[in-house]
Each structure stands twice: as structure tokens, then as C-alpha cells.
């Protein structure tokens, strides 16, 4: 396998989970940090939708974070994450991608959401984190 190339954005939670799985699996990867305001032409050629993360490896492209995670774990899964209860795993993923992501954005960008103090958004997000 050639070295994988991951187009990423450090603050994107979907790119974060792709990086986490790649790191955990030990897959050699070169990470290209992307400015979302000036996306590289090379990335857009691989994935015209223009979202991160985008993984290029062995002539193929994976441009969904969960698919990148599953691919990485299929390469090497030392603690058996893929063997976990699929229904429980999917429920956590769904809660992360919906409710938690909603609160995370409000906490990270509190100036855009002045309806509540940022501490309220943080506390709402912590409810999910305590389940992990």
C-alpha cells in the first residue's frame, strides 16, 4: 500500500474522527491541512463536492469520514473496535452527528449564537461526552 493522503481541516469534527481512526490503525498517512476558503484543486479533482475529509490511497478516494474510519480499521484494528455492538455504535455516531455536533458548533462559535452564554452550549455538549 502506498502512503495515504488525507485532506483535512483541523476544526472539522468529521475530519477529526477520520484522523483519529487513521492514527489508531497506524496507517501511514500524509495530512494536508485545507483552508476551506481556498480548497486545493488537487482535492477538488478527487472529490468535487469539496468537503473534508478526503482520503486518497492506492488510486482510490474515500470522501466520507465514517467510510474512512471503517477503511482504516479494516487495515488494522488492534483493540477490536469493529467488533463492538453495531447498534450501540451506530446510536453513538448518530447522537454525535446530530445533537452533539449542533451543541459543539454553538460552543465553538458562540458569537454567532448569542441566545445563550457559551457555557450553556458547553454543558449541553458535555451530556453526550459523559456517555463515552
Language model features with spans:
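Short, intrinsically disordered, charge-balanced linker/junction segments flanking boundaries
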Residues: 128-132
Amino acid at each position: 500500500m502506498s502512503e495515504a493522503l488525507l485532506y483535512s481541516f483541523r476544526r472539522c469534527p468529521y475530519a477529526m474522527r477520520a484522523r483519529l481512526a487513521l492514527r489508531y490503525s497506524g496507517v501511514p498517512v500524509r495530512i494536508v491541512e485545507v483552508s476551506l476558503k481556498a480548497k486545493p484543486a488537487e482535492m477538488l479533482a478527487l472529490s468535487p463536492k469539496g468537503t473534508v475529509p478526503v482520503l486518497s490511497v492506492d488510486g482510490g478516494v474515500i470522501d466520507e469520514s465514517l467510510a474512512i474510519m471503517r477503511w482504516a480499521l479494516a487495515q488494522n484494528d488492534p483493540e477490536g473496535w469493529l467488533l463492538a455492538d453495531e447498534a450501540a455504535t451506530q446510536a453513538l455516531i448518530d447522537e454525535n452527528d446530530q445533537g452533539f455536533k449542533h451543541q459543539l458548533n454553538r460552543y465553538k462559535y458562540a458569537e454567532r449564537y448569542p441566545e445563550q452564554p457559551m457555557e450553556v452550549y458547553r454543558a449541553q455538549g458535555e451530556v453526550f461526552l459523559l456517555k463515552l
